[in-house]
């Protein structure tokens, strides 16, 4: 199968017209950095099954009780501490002051259990002990579901001390709530190097429940190899990339990722190293990354003798405010520094810039049962930064500050909102929606703009067909999951960008509007092999240069392990 993938990619290499034609404006380091950024994460999927309380036998009516009824004037409770007796009596108002049968009393007990579950105490159970009814008061015994022991079974690459650090945050000997348990199990499953499934078992002490985690180790090394025609003719239309992950090599739940990518013409190459380390047992994570990108332009821009590079250092810290199966709310604060250099030997020109920035990202996602169920994700990023030029050669800075120049130097701020929705229609059919909005307070460098065109945004257009300081991108799709291994989608996209926040001229059009429509297909081929294909037709504005009388094709083949 791997050789089939190689052969298919070789076919792509013989068909460069299917990939894209070069835009009129030559790409620079900033725009190529945009081109290499990974696509936005999709809406969430459930990562663990629902956590359910162990099944308990239903109570049986005493022999000879028949249709006997008792006049109930009130209820008393034993064993409750998490919820007061007064609160529980309010939950049983409908059963008070009535003549109740045994079945009615069981319903009252179930109402008490429902009140506990509403508060998150999913292990709570109510019982009807032998009664000595006085003045019509019924006694209900409550087992609130105290946590007994926590145990690990199986093996993981993650140290048991690290895993127990998360389990030790559970309130041993106290009533256990579903949100607390669910959060810790999900956080454990985010650790690189292992997976864990939960089993709840009756504890040795009456009314207690033991938490047992069955662990399975992940491979030390995982990765993905991908071949695609996602590139640009000026730097190489066909790409090959490799990502390698070291999963918990130090048994701390950390992940270290090394990545490399190059094109068939070697006009573009990128390489990077990224690390992610959990800190403590509350969900804190620190990240650090170093990446580099080198390019040289060919094709229609070969006469420019242009080349350059981007070097990026990034560090961040993240924390999940809410972590559950149904909804999540996370914060991520990142600081970065980017050095961008563009060289043009044809004019003996060099542009040397540095951008330092700080970004706060708030991410929220949720699963719901609305009209058959669906998932929603939203990411709001607030970024503030500063662009400086290397003033050892002031020519680039002076050109930037001309009245007709881009005027990007100095401080800037921008806000980006990305929202997605996946709506289930039937088991096989779903609707997908996506919107990306960006606003800023000044003219931005090409690396900070909203860019349209390419397989991730508007596949009917070439990479970097249009970019602007502010704008909107809307994507709609209907997806049909024909079988577990194959899905096909029909989509339409629309994008509009304002080229400059503060244009140098008011007589020149300061925006571009693009639209496209097409069809895509995704395959899972055997174990680890994937393939995707996109055919898209440009719509509202023709591509630059125009060739909108035929579709643009994008193909990707991958193997993960």
Please provide the spans of the model-predicted regions.
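Residues that define the transmembrane beta-barrel architecture of outer-membrane proteins
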Residues: 207, 236-240, 267-271, 309-313, ...
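Membrane-embedded beta-strand positions of outer-membrane beta-barrel proteins
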Residues: 223-225, 244, 256-260, 286-290, ...
């Amino acid at each position: 199968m791997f050789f089939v993938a190689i052969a298919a990619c070789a076919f792509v290499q013989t068909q460069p017209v299917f990939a894209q034609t070069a835009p009129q404006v030559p790409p620079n380091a900033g725009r190529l950095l945009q081109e290499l950024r990974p696509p936005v994460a999709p809406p969430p999927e459930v990562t663990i099954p629902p956590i359910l309380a162990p099944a308990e036998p239903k109570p049986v009516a005493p022999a000879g009780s028949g249709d006997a009824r008792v006049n109930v004037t009130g209820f008393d409770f034993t064993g409750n501490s998490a919820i007061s007796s007064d609160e529980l009596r309010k939950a049983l108002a409908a059963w008070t002051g009535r003549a109740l049968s045994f079945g009615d009393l069981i319903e009252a007990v179930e109402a008490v259990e429902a009140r506990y579950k509403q508060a998150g105490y999913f292990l709570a159970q109510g019982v009807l002990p032998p009664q000595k009814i006085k003045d019509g008061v019924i006694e209900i015994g409550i087992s609130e579901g105290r946590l007994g022991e926590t145990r690990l079974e199986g093996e993981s690459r993650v140290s048991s001390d690290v895993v127990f650090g998360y389990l030790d945050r559970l309130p041993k000997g106290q009533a256990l709530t579903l949100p607390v348990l669910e959060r810790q199990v999900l956080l454990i499953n985010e650790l690189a190097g292992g997976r864990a499934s939960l089993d709840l078992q009756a504890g040795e002490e009456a009314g207690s429940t033991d938490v047992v985690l069955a662990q399975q180790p992940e491979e030390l090394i995982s990765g993905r190899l991908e071949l695609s025609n996602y590139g640009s003719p000026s730097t190489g239309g066909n790409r090959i990339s490799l990502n390698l992950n070291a999963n918990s090599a130090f048994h701390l739940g950390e992940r270290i990722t090394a990545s490399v990518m190059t094109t068939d013409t070697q006009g573009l190459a990128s390489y990077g190293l990224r690390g992610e380390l959990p800190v403590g047992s509350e969900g804190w994570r620190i990240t650090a990354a170093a990446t580099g990108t080198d390019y040289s332009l060919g094709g229609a821009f070969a006469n420019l003798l242009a080349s350059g590079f981007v070097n990026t250092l990034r560090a961040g810290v993240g924390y999940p405010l809410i972590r559950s199966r149904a909804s999540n709310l996370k914060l991520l604060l990142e600081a970065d520094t980017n050095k961008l250099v563009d060289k043009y030997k044809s004019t003996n020109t060099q542009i040397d810039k540095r951008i330092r920035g700080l970004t706060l990202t708030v991410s929220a996602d949720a699963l719901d049962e609305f009209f058959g169920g669906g998932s929603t994700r939203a990411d709001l990023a607030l970024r503030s930064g500063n662009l400086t030029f290397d003033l050892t050669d002031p020519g680039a800075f002076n050109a930037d500050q001309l009245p007709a120049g881009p005027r990007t130097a100095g401080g800037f701020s921008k806000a980006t909102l990305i929202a997605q929705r996946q709506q289930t229609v039937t088991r096989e059919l779903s609707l997908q929606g996506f919107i990306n909005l960006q606003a800023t307070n000044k003219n931005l460098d090409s690396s900070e703009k909203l860019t349209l065109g390419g397989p991730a945004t508007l596949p009917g257009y070439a990479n970097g067909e249009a970019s602007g300081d502010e704008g909107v991108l809307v994507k709609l799709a209907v997806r049909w999951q024909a079988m577990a291994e194959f899905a096909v989608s029909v989509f339409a996209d629309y994008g509009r960008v304002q080229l400059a926040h503060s244009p140098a001229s008011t007589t020149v059009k300061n925006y571009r509007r693009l639209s496209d429509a097409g069809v895509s297909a995704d395959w899972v081929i055997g174990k680890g092999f994937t393939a995707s294909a996109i055919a898209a037709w440009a719509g509202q504005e023709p591509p630059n240069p125009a060739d909108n009388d035929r579709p643009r094709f994008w193909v990707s083949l991958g193997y993960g392990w």
